[in-house]
Amino acid sequence: MSMQDPIADMLTRIRNAQQVGKTSVTMPSSKLKKSIAGVLKEEGYVGEFSVNDAAKAELTVELKYFEGKPVIAELDRVSRPGLRSYVGKDELPSVRGGLGIAIVSTSKGVMTDRAARAAGVGGEILCTVF
């Protein structure tokens, strides 16, 4: 069976693993998923991540907790295969008054909404994290 939305699958795996208190989560790997994991690591939402280059590449993400609670309170998919969400540089959203981040796929790579604003580029809003 083919997967319709691999990014939504990644976000759901992270959300589910955090709800049951797992220390890490494993999923099929792709360049886009590695980029998203890199942004989440830079922003401090997850720990280290690694790619196992076996027959099928797998991405393992270490999850973070603070005082027993998951660091990620909310993880939502915005742009999806049935309804893509593209914004210009002036329309980039501010998540929860700047406390959260939006992960944006731009022509300069995958980055946060703040980095995209600083670079002066818009793109596809993949997801929001708070």
Swiss-Prot record:
One protein family per Pfam: Ribosomal_S8
Any one cellular-component term (Gene Ontology): ribosome
A GO biological-process term: translation
Single annotated GO MF: structural constituent of ribosome
Keyword presence, Nucleotide-binding: no
PROSITE patterns from the UniProt entry: RIBOSOMAL_S8 (PS00053)
Alphabetized InterPro entries for the sequence: Ribosomal_uS8 (IPR000630), Ribosomal_uS8_CS (IPR047863), Ribosomal_uS8_sf (IPR035987)
SUPFAM superfamilies: Ribosomal protein S8
Sorted UniProt keywords: Ribonucleoprotein, Ribosomal protein, RNA-binding, rRNA-binding
Record flagged with keyword rRNA-binding: yes
HAMAP family, per the entry: Ribosomal_uS8_B
Record text on subunit structure and interactions: Part of the 30S ribosomal subunit. Contacts proteins S5 and S12.
Recorded family membership: Belongs to the universal ribosomal protein uS8 family.
Known function: One of the primary rRNA binding proteins, it binds directly to 16S rRNA central domain where it helps coordinate assembly of the platform of the 30S subunit.
Protein known as: Small ribosomal subunit protein uS8
Protein's organism: Saccharophagus degradans (strain 2-40 / ATCC 43961 / DSM 17024)
Organismal lineage: Bacteria, Pseudomonadati, Pseudomonadota, Gammaproteobacteria, Cellvibrionales
